[in-house]
């Protein structure tokens, strides 16, 4: 064994206890000197190069000369391909110089070398958020600050560059300010667009290493409404030989590597008539996520107390969903006299037991794509757990209230600080 791998006296040094957290701190210092105590100095005291930070005020504009037609209402894809708006934003980064000036330019292909880091080592992260045309005529984005903060966490987790989340938010708003008025016209209240900020490692060199070049880009696309399936969502629990995430891993980060390995099980579940996988973890079968959405149950305790229960964030098994956070906040603020909001580990056996005892009231999934979606059935090891899901599977009373409150905020029926209004004066 190499001497460096042989701790003295059988004890691990303090510097070995949390390598990932230390690496994240150093990554932040490298690309955000203004966010550190001393500009240009990392937390380990090593002098850092004077690199450029991400700066939305440097955004340049090159408008398309070939604008495309907006698809008819209800059309969201073209021969199976996503339909995107006229423009996108790109920003290059290098370890030597930091962030280049952002560019708003016509939507089109990216140029990558076959040896680009992202194509071999999954150095990729992304976010998903929506812009809404309100019934009051205004254009809004729902809580973009939360998505930008989460993208920073995802980026540094896979050794991509850091940035100030507020600058990314400004770029998102700038892109929607240009494309929003055309692609979400006032004549289509109640419609939305899907925004996808993405960062990829672009360094053209094979070898397992942190990329020294990266590209941040933001695109906007149409997406079919993923409303609650008729009768409610049906889940199939994950097989014993497969997990989506694990303690000490990266299930909490929105990285592409979390999604590809789950597609096989999801495809098989859909072939059997189910909509998503309910991902279980550990020998006790802890409930974690429903597909790529956060999972909730509403039940009564044996003492008669109604609880809204979801998995916790402290072990980093699940994604800290923006909709999840919004649901929890609204439940605590507006349902405090009716329900107790609980974030804890709970198992599929607890769900089955609550159902058998008549204590399982409702269940739903939350996320940007499915929003708040009632769950009507969970299939586990050959048996079905039937869950009350309201009339037509549209959701029970608690699910519906939470969903309707969020709809009102997103579409401007309720003025709320979560709905960020986009300027349309560009």
Predicted regions, residues:
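Feature captures the catalytic cores and cofactor-binding loops of soluble hydro-lyases/lyases
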Residues: 321-326
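Conserved alpha/beta cores of soluble small-molecule-handling proteins
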Residues: 2-276, 282-286, 329-426
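Glycine- and Gly-Pro-enriched alpha-helical subdomains that act as flexible
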Residues: 286-318
């Amino acid at each position: 064994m190499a001497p460096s791998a042989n701790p003295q006296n059988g004890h691990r040094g303090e510097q070995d206890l949390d390598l990932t957290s230390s690496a994240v701190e150093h990554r932040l210092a490298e690309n955000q000197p203004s966010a550190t105590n001393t500009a240009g100095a990392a937390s380990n005291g090593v002098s850092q190069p004077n690199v450029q930070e991400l700066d939305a005020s440097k955004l340049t504009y090159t408008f398309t000369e070939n604008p495309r037609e907006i698809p008819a209402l209800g059309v969201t894809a073209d021969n199976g391909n996503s339909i995107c708006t006229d423009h996108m934003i790109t920003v290059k980064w290098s370890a030597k110089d930091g962030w280049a000036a952002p560019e708003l330019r016509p939507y089109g292909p990216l140029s990558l070398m076959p040896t680009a880091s992202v194509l071999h080592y999954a150095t990729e992260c992304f976010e998903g958020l929506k812009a809404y045309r309100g019934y009051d005529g205004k254009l809004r984005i729902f809580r973009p600050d939360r998505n930008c903060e989460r993208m920073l966490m995802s980026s540094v987790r896979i050794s991509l560059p850091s940035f100030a989340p507020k600058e990314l938010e400004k770029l998102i708003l700038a892109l929607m300010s240009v494309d929003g008025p055309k692609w979400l016209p006032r004549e289509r209240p109640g419609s939305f667009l899907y925004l996808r900020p993405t960062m990829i490692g672009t360094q053209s060199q094979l070898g397992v290493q942190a990329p020294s070049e990266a590209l941040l880009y933001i695109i906007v696309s149409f997406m079919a409404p993923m409303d609650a399936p008729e009768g409610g969502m049906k889940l199939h629990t994950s097989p014993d030989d497969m997990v989506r995430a694990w303690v000490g891993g990266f299930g909490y980060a929105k990285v592409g590597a979390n999604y590809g390995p789950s597609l096989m099980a999801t495809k098989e579940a859909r072939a059997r008539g189910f909509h998503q996988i309910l991902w279980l973890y550990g020998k006790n079968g802890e409930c974690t996520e429903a597909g790529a959405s956060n999972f909730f149950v509403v039940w009564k305790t044996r003492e008669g107390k109604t609880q809204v229960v979801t998995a916790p964030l402290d072990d980093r098994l699940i994604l800290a969903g923006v909709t999840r956070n919004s649901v929890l906040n609204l439940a605590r603020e507006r349902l405090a006299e009716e329900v107790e909001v609980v974030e804890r580990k709970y198992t599929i056996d607890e769900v089955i037991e609550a159902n058998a005892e008549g204590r399982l009231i409702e269940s739903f999934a939350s996320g940007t794509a499915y929003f708040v979606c009632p769950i009507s059935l969970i299939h586990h090891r050959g048996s079905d757990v039937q869950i009350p899901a309201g009339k037509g599977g549209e959701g029970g009373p608690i699910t519906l209230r939470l969903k309707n409150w969020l709809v009102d905020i997103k579409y401007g029926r309720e003025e709320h600080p979560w709905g960020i209004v986009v300027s349309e004066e560009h």
